[in-house]
């Protein structure tokens, strides 16, 4: 590792963490924009929030600018276009169920003809402001709820009775949009995942005229969805198991493992398994994002020393040298040393100190590189767009998701499992009563 990184990373990261994480005011001269794609399922979720959002925007941010693109971006994490589309639809179904968005039980991407008709409707309509946003939502409903008859009728009316309109707050272009997002003050916010962060920012700058109420079933960090003792015992008795596939040079891996181990594992009796991955170049991360997430999750962070490829190998070597039953705790302590104490485990003195702390008399003779490759292959088979990748197993079912943005799914899944369990028990009880009456 570069001597500069070993010396200066801990100093710089501590300073960065302690400085104010937000500039006082983001510029408003370019207003607030939302970027959509008619065949993007996240855009479908986003448009269901737009009328309410625009209704509480301060006048200086009105009208909300709507940018509609025909072009998708490249799928992330070397996923194929089909894998990405399948992932998005499944993820959107989960978000829709959690936050009560309207969504079809078996959604399908819109056809090319439907997309052409939808764009023509939106280009021709003279509606503006709230009226346009309600039309936009209706058009997305038609596209994603398989309402082709309604769409054809509206298309015929729009193309027959109206000319193409040209409004500055309505933009059609081919700039790639992978998934819907907002843009404000030069910053991008994921349309669903970052919506609450965006509204917090707008509220801080007094750019909202009323309190925002979005994503009503959002689960806050360090708040448990299940607190009833009986329900908690039922989840614990199901022995849930959680696999974590983590890139060791990625600070999100530390934040996620620490949060789950400190807050969820013992509480819900979750058995953790950790699968370290080979180096993926994620040491070049967004420092401000990692800092903000650490404060939101209330997980210790900085001073850190970003691991290089060599350092991640040394970290994995220590992990696999620990007894199997102690490996999760070993990984927690290894990542803690790197991300909260600025240890460089490619540096011999730091490595040997960590080895002593873990009480490892000897290092593993296993081929660590091969073990990491096996983990990479297992992780790739999950077809997820981002790291860390999580797989939760409970009550005979398996659930795969990814990133710190989806940690809330653990508790949401537990709640759904209990709901289905009670529903099944009630149905069985009802059937038993009915049979008794028949006899």
Regions found by a protein language model. Name each.
Residues 45-143, 254-341, 421, 433-436:
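Structural alpha/beta surface segment adjacent to cysteine/selenocysteine redox centers
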Residues 37, 108, 184-186, 306:
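Short, well-ordered beta-to-alpha junction loops that form the rim of enzyme active sites
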Residues 81-84, 88, 160, 249, ...:
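Residue-level preference for long, well-ordered alpha-helices that form the structural scaffold
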Residues 66-68, 194, 247, 277-279, ...:
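An acidic- and aromatic-residue-enriched active-site/binding cleft used to recognize and process polar
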Residues 236:
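Phosphate-binding P-loop
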Residues 36-39, 246-249:
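Short pre-active-site segment immediately N-terminal to redox-active cysteine/selenocysteine motifs
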Residues 23:
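N-terminal glycine-rich phosphate/pyrophosphate-binding loop and immediately adjacent elements
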Residues 3-7, 11-12, 18, 27-32, ...:
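C-terminal cap of thioredoxin/glutaredoxin-like
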